[in-house]
């Protein structure tokens, strides 16, 4: 059976201000199933932002596991991500999950990959999903050449990705944290 997939998730930071946004499209094969899905949300008492790309059910499983790690490690994003990655590599069920998480707090921006890797991308930009490369390119240009706040960069970059990627739409959810 085909999985629900296709999205763009983007996080941009300037200093300790970080925005994380995503589009709302969910597809099953070549059919749009939902246009207003919420794939980005604040977690851990609103102090951390998280977004997912990949299989929806798989992503919710990862969200739950990551939130449990955050509780265990008092909201330490990096430690929680590393501990989740360790579980991911050793747990048979987790290894079968087809999803990625983008997480950010005022100090860290991370990608937790489907291989159980934890990556801290350069330049404060995290982009995952089918439209991630388009959004990342736009965000990098805007971050380097304008004084726009992170949420505006995320908004404009998601719009560009939605114009180019057939699995990304123009229904956006953008969350912001101020450090």
Curated annotation (Swiss-Prot):
It catalyses: ATP-dependent cleavage of peptide bonds with broad specificity. Gene3D superfamilies: Glutamine Phosphoribosylpyrophosphate, subunit 1, domain 1. This is ATP-dependent protease subunit HslV. GO terms for molecular function: metal ion binding; threonine-type endopeptidase activity. One of its GO terms (cellular component) is proteasome core complex. A double ring-shaped homohexamer of HslV is capped on each side by a ring-shaped HslU homohexamer. The assembly of the HslU/HslV complex is dependent on binding of ATP. Allosterically activated by HslU binding. Protease subunit of a proteasome-like degradation complex believed to be a general protein degrading machinery. Its EC number is 3.4.25.2. It is found in: Cytoplasm. Its main location: cytoplasm. It comes from Aromatoleum aromaticum (strain DSM 19018 / LMG 30748 / EbN1) (Azoarcus sp. (strain EbN1)). Na(+) binds at residues 162, 165, 168. Belongs to the peptidase T1B family. HslV subfamily. NCBIfam families: ATP_dep_HslV (TIGR03692), PRK05456.1 (NF003964). Keywords: Allosteric enzyme, Cytoplasm, Hydrolase, Metal-binding, Protease, Sodium, Stress response, Threonine protease. HAMAP family: HslV.
């Amino acid at each position: 059976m085909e999985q629900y997939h296709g999205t763009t998730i983007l996080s941009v930071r300037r200093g300790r201000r970080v925005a994380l946004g995503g589009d709302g499209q969910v597809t099953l094969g070549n059919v749009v199933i939902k246009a207003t899905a919420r794939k980005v949300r604040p977690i851990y008492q609103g102090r951390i932002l998280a977004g997912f790309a990949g299989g929806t059910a798989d992503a919710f499983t990862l969200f739950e596991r990551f939130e449990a790690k955050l509780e265990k490690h008092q909201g330490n994003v990096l430690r929680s991500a590393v501990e989740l990655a360790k579980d991911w590599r050793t747990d048979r069920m987790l290894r079968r999950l087809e999803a990625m998480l983008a997480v950010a707090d005022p100090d860290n921006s991370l990608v937790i990959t489907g291989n159980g890797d934890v990556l801290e991308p350069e330049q404060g930009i995290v982009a995952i999903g089918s439209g991630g490369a388009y959004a990342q390119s736009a965000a990098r240009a805007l971050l380097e050449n304008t004084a726009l706040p992170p949420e505006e960069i995320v908004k404009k970059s998601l719009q560009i990705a939605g114009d180019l990627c057939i699995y990304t739409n123009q229904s956006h959810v953008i969350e912001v944290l101020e450090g």
